């Protein structure tokens, strides 16, 4: 058993239980593996009105200094940042100053490992704490740091952080190509067994029946390209389908799974993804998926589920191909909880032997 201090920019909040659900899954898994985990949620200082800039920021402004999640305490530390980070050195200095508060919160408890989810800017604080406790530091990148951060004005800090941690973990092979010294440990699929369903062949009136489409994201997030999903539904309607489409606006996980059970197909139109966890959850819930060619989708989804082009017509063709198909879709073992826990255990053992 290891004592793990986990810092994360993304974590469920009292007013936003959907924020960072994939990080909460990892924390839960670590505890199931027998590790003792203490969680620090790094958040920017902001006014309530500024939450409207991005739906993922809902609940950030008024998040308490400390709260409980699944009966475990979570410490919130704040840093100062401006939109688009015009002063990255200011942000770095701001988050470093929170180290003392974290140390006071931990008291006599000393971590064997420091783990951080996302590099900018949480890894700056993680590195300082790892140095303070002489512990190895692991950084897990979910996509934004690489796909957006490497072209931002703080890219040099991200490159420096990536080189300074003892191990960089990425969640997909696509990200590993850009970070050659990383190891791939994907996010596992966390769907209760009682909610898991096999995918059944669609039964209905071809090009006349009703089609319930799930847009498995918050439609307000521009990178998810809700407009393309709407265009696809309009194209399906011109072919005779009666289409309804709904999204998932920051709702708890149980409601996500309920919506997946109620719909006929999930439609993913994102402009930027590393490995859409929601697509895997949909498959486990028995909901077929149609997607643009994004992230790692091609590595495990059958070809007929991937649109040949990023157009409403190509996506509508893929939707109809999936509805006709009788092919079963099986998730690879790498997304199973057992595989992920084994890979994490191997990583921890190797790093703790070195330290």
Short names for language-model regions:
Residues 199-201, 324-355:
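A charged, aromatic-enriched C-terminal amphipathic alpha-helix characteristic of glycosyltransferases
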Residues 1-63, 68:
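N-terminal subdomain of nucleotide-sugar transferases
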Residues 258-263:
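Short alpha-helical donor nucleotide-sugar binding micro-motif in glycosyltransferases
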Residues 149-152, 188-209:
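Acidic anion/phosphate-binding donor-loop and adjacent secondary structure
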Residues 271:
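Aromatic "clamp/platform" in nucleotide-sugar-dependent glycosyltransferases that forms part
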Residues 279, 288-291:
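Short hydrophobic beta-strand element within catalytic cores of glycosyltransferases
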Residues 5, 200-224, 230-233:
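Conserved donor-binding/catalytic core segment of Leloir-type glycosyltransferases
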Residues 304-313, 320-325:
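Conserved acidic donor-binding segment of nucleotide-sugar-dependent glycosyltransferases
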């Amino acid at each position: 058993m290891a004592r793990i201090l986990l810092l994360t920019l993304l974590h469920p909040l009292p007013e936003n239980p959907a924020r960072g659900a994939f990080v909460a899954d990892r924390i839960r898994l670590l505890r199931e593996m027998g590790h003792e985990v203490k969680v620090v949620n790094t958040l920017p200082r902001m006014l309530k009105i500024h939450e409207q800039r991005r739906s993922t920021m809902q609940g950030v402004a008024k998040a308490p200094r400390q709260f409980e999640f699944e009966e475990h305490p979570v410490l919130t530390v704040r840093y100062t940042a401006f939109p688009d980070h015009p002063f990255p050195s200011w942000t770095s200095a701001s988050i470093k100053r929170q180290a003392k508060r974290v140390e006071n919160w931990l008291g006599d408890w000393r971590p064997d490992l420091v783990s951080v989810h996302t590099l900018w800017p949480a890894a700056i604080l993680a590195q300082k704490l790892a140095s303070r406790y002489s512990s190895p530091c692991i950084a897990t990148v979910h996509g934004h740091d690489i796909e957006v951060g490497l072209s931002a004005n703080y890219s040099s800090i991200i490159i420096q952080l990536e080189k300074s941690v003892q191990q960089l973990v990425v969640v997909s092979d696509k990200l590993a190509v850009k970070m050659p010294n990383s190891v791939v440990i994907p996010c596992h699929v966390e769907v209760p067994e009682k909610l898991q369903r096999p995918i059944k062949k669609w039964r209905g009136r071809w090009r006349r029946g009703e089609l319930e489409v799930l847009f498995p994201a918050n439609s307000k997030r521009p990178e998810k390209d809700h407009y393309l999903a709407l265009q696809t539904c309009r194209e399906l309607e011109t072919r005779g389908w009666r289409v309804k489409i709904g999204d998932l606006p920051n709702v708890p996980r149980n409601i996500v799974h309920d919506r997946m059970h109620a719909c006929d197909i999930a439609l993913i139109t994102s402009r930027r993804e590393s490995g859409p966890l929601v697509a895997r959850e949909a498959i486990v819930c028995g909901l077929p998926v149609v997607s643009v060619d994004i992230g790692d989708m091609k590595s495990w989804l059958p070809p007929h589920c991937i649109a040949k082009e990023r157009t409403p017509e190509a996506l509508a063709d893929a939707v109809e191909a999936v509805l006709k198909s009788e092919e079963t879709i099986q998730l690879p073992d790498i997304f199973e909880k057992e595989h992920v826990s084994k890979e994490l255990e191997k990583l921890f053992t190797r790093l703790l032997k070195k330290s």
